Amino acid sequence: MSHLAQLRQRHGIDRVIDHLQTCLRQSAPLPELETLAAIAHQSPFHFHRLYRALTGETPGRTVARLRLLQALHLLSATESRVTDVALQVGYESSQALARACRQTLQATPSALREDAVLRAQWQQRLSIPAGDDLNDQVPLQVHVTALDPFDVVVLRTHGAFDDLDQAFGRIHAWAAGVGIADQLQQLAGIALNDHRDQPAGACLFDCAMGFGRLKEAVPAPLRLMTLGGGDHAVLRHVGGYAELEAATDALLRHWLPDSGRLLRDAPLYYHYLDDPEDVPEAILRADICVPLQ
């Protein structure tokens, strides 16, 4: 059993995958994320991120993989009709199944039904999560420390990952307008989804800037929020900020399981230490701050 497979077993992720597979086999409705977290005996707060770290794929990608796997199993029956197979595993039509087969398996359903060797090869590849191919066990310098809480002005943005600087610019423009821009103390961010798994323009992110304790209210869509406070696992990342999610995965995959600590229901955030406009990407620094119980 691989290291990742052991971790999935320990954290209840295997139970989630088995449940999803059972739902597809029985043509049952797929459960909500909160139900999946309960099956894994994990808090729903960080479940999606933990699942991604231990499988290398989102729950949605797992469903897509298992749906194709079940379709291949049903296609092995020579009397099966492609339309019946498609509907049985949850596709809306035979065309939807054909499209998924072409995009992922580079073959049509009919070709896969007729070629037992090709079908078996894909069944073997689809039987394990994408993350089993990961080989990123490198030493991590993680420090557990109690962080002081700090207030930030937050602007939620929905768009391209590369356009986050525009949201930070809007916060800074407001701060300049009220005369506190020179009091900037922290630059932080909270990823509300994973830009690696989203189509272009669908990144959901909270951009945050700290100016100390504010005396005045902030106008919508800006809002106030408190970050930090309590124990955190802190990992210093050096490199492009687009790589922070992968570094977070490594922390959750390789440090957390043997740390003896549990995740706390509070935001995981990135504390940016350098300005990309002033510092080359290769040496940009940011602290990944993971809240712990």
Model-derived segments and spans:
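DNA-binding recognition helix and immediately preceding turn/loop
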Residues: 3-58, 74-94
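A solvent-exposed interaction/effector surface
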Residues: 45, 50-53, 61, 65, ...
